[in-house]
Amino acid sequence: MNQEEFKQYISYAIEDYAKDKIASGNWSEDEAIDLSRESFARLLPKDEKTENNHLLSIFHNDILVGMIWISQKAPTKPNEGFIYDFVIFEQYQGQGHGKKAMKEAEIIAKELGMNKIGLNVFGHNKIARGLYEKMGYEITNITMSKTI
């Protein structure tokens, strides 16, 4: 991902993450954008050049259809990765781009020395959950809540 692609991605991602955190009941609408900005600033202090973070643009026929962000978990566990974000833009969903991109991301992760990848998916994101399950990802933790 180059600097221009990162600028496009980060403005989209901050808003999208804020919406997901609101939908999941974690954040209020009043605080969501600020908290989302803070999260991205903390995780990507050097933007697309942040060490051990690999932000990849996903193209189909020279058209940007999405992106994926893979991070090596920690210096003490360089063989473990974490997918912080994975987006196929809405107009390109359901066309096989997600499955293809996940397969390619796994190849890249292996080339970087990773042998395990984790990710988080919001409970309300049934489409993403379905894709990850089809790709062989297994549930390792479940957080549940109830409004009373």
Please provide the spans of the model-predicted regions:
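Conserved GNAT acetyl-CoA-binding A-motif
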Residues: 81, 102, 110-120, 143
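Conserved active-site alpha-helix within GNAT-family acetyltransferase domains
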Residues: 99, 123-141
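Acetyl-CoA-dependent GNAT
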Residues: 3-89, 139-148
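Conserved acetyl-CoA pyrophosphate-binding loop and the N-cap/start of the following alpha-helix
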Residues: 92, 96-104
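Residues that form or flank phosphate/diphosphate-binding pockets in enzymes
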Residues: 78, 96, 127
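Active-site acidic-Proline motif in GNAT/NAT acetyltransferases
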Residues: 89-91, 95, 123-124
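Short glycine-rich hinge loops at helix-strand junctions in the catalytic core
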Residues: 96, 113, 136
